[in-house]
């Protein structure tokens, strides 16, 4: 979806991908599932839904499309910490990416997290984040230093503990604002 922060697209471009945008649903601001299949080409390798403002993209039809075309799902959950889709956490449908930047619902000051239930992907990500090193001075690939510091981990742990309370407060605020807006004449 083009309705996201540039970092989403930068990650794809840095991986050598060609990005093909699909518009958003005007109600949810998430990927418009009805447009996805028409955008798929023989070169397509993944669908990258963006979960936005705590709202999950419509994952069931996206998963069906991905399965039908043998595509990966790479979720941008940077603005949806703790969000659910039919009882399942966003970031659990394929490879999920979360941002811990200071403006997010949960922060470590900077950085992020990748989630996956694919052991091979998890192994590769661990290598990439630690200079390509599997064991002390055993390097298997080119990597980078993308490790979280102990201080960031401590902040993140504290943030995780209060995340449910934050989410509930945001939901209550949204409900209150919606109620007030509903009273306005258009």
Question: Which residue stretches match the model-derived regions?
Answer:
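Active-site-proximal alpha-helical scaffold in enzymes
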Residues: 109-116
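Conserved active-site segment immediately N-terminal to the catalytic lysine
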Residues: 75-107, 135-140
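Histidine-centered beta-alpha loop that forms part of the nucleotide-sugar donor binding/catalytic region
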Residues: 3-4, 17, 24, 78-79, ...
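A secondary-structure boundary/capping signal
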Residues: 1-2, 77, 102, 117, ...
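PLP-dependent aminotransferase-like
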Residues: 1-77, 84
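Nucleotide-sugar-dependent glycosyltransferase donor-binding/catalytic pocket residues
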Residues: 5, 29, 54-55, 102-108, ...
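PLP-dependent aminotransferase class I/II
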Residues: 34, 46-50, 55, 59-61, ...
């Amino acid at each position: 979806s083009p309705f996201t922060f540039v970092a989403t697209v930068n990650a794809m471009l840095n991986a050598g991908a060609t990005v093909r945008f699909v518009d958003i649903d005007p109600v949810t601001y998430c990927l418009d599932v009805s447009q996805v299949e028409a955008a798929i080409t023989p070169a397509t390798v993944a669908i990258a839904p963006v979960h936005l403002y705590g709202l999950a993209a419509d994952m069931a039809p996206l998963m069906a499309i991905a399965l039908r075309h043998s595509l990966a799902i790479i979720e941008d959950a940077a603005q949806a910490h703790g969000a659910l889709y039919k009882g399942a956490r966003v970031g659990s449908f394929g490879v999920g990416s979360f941002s811990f930047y200071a403006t997010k619902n949960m922060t470590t000051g900077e950085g992020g997290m990748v989630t996956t239930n694919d052991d091979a992907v998890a192994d590769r990500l661990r290598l990439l984040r630690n200079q390509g090193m599997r064991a002390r001075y055993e390097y298997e690939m080119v990597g980078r230093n993308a490790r979280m510091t102990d201080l960031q981990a401590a902040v993140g742990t504290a943030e995780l503990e209060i995340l449910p309370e934050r989410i509930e407060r945001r939901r209550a605020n949204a409900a209150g604002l919606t109620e007030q807006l509903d009273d306005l004449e258009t």
